[in-house]
Amino acid sequence: MDLMPTNHAELMAFLSEYKIFSAAIILLYSLVVTMIIMPRIVIISKKKNLTAQTNSRTSHKGVVPTLGGVGVFTGLILTVNFAAILFADYEQYVNLSIFNILTLLLLLVGITDDLMNTSPRKKFLYQLLISLVFIFGTNIHIDSFFGLLGIHDIPNVLASVFSAFVIVLLINAYNLIDGIDGLAGLVGVIVSGFMALAFYLSGNFFYSLISLSLVGALISFLIYNFSRRMKIFLGDTGSMVVGFVLAYQVVLYLSLANGNSEAFVFKNAPIFALALVSYPLFDTLRVMCLRLLNKKSPFLADRNHIHHRLIDLGLAHKYASLAVAFYTLLVTIVAVSINSLPINIAFIIMLVVVTCLLLLPFAICKKEGAWSLRFPKA
């Protein structure tokens, strides 16, 4: 009983000392807040007819609201700022204020797109502008490759431009994998969950709480995403916001790791980060290359994604999503297990593992209910 705090000062000391307990509270807070908000968004969206339209690429039936991202955003922002009151220092609070404003702007871009179909070019310009403001406003950027490909420190201007490019790339890559039930949500949970662990182990507790806030919000979203009666999609609203938050975590982690590498458990920080986001990056680059080879716009939507291939092989949405989630978990564990290797050797190993695993669905054919491997002829 003596351990229990009796006043505000003791409460703060208690929360700071028992960090696992505090982290669990933040995770639960985010989950509950989002759970409360999400059904209201479903009801309002149906009343206002803010729902997904079926087309040749969609596989859902019936009326499904597309503003799940509003619920995820609300749960995330309320939780992150609650955590900031308890644990953030002045610099973290200033950077969080910038993060809040820019995430809200990105949410508005997503809502506009979900309701009125913004052109890809306009979305790209908004994303680029928001990313540049974030990088220059917070001074959080990737300023080293840690020796990957022989590159170490990067000049400030180039580092800022490259970091903005990474953020825009990850926003769009995450947006493109949001094609079947559960996929974007599960990938987001795994990426943000590992980032929470990485921040915690490196002594950046507040940043781990940001990651856990997203985990809790996405778990709540997944419950409704898999529901039949109260089903909801992330929409561009959610995929852009979540993609931005995931990109923020990756850029922040690499920025911190370069400044204090001895405190970071994962010596090969870029390999760890690349493994986490390898699925959306690989899928996006593959699809873009195919479109360009076929002389089509790289922004033209189609059914050439890996998750579409898994569906064509007979997997239900949830099993296809679980397969990708398992892949993400597996390659991240591989990245951690080869952490002690020289970074370029680790990169080659990861490149081979990722390429083989993600091209495997295209080497499998299904005939008369049976699966078999097929290989290109010489």
Feature roles, as predicted:
Residues 158-174, 183-184:
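Function-critical hydrophobic alpha-helical transmembrane segments in multi-pass membrane proteins
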Residues 53-67:
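Juxtamembrane helix-capping/reentrant segments at transmembrane boundaries
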Residues 97-129, 134:
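Hydrophobic alpha-helical hairpins/lids featuring a short glycine-rich hinge
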Residues 2-49, 73-88, 92-104, 108, ...:
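Alpha-helical transmembrane segments
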Residues 145-154, 315, 341:
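Membrane interface segments of multi-pass transport proteins and intramembrane proteases
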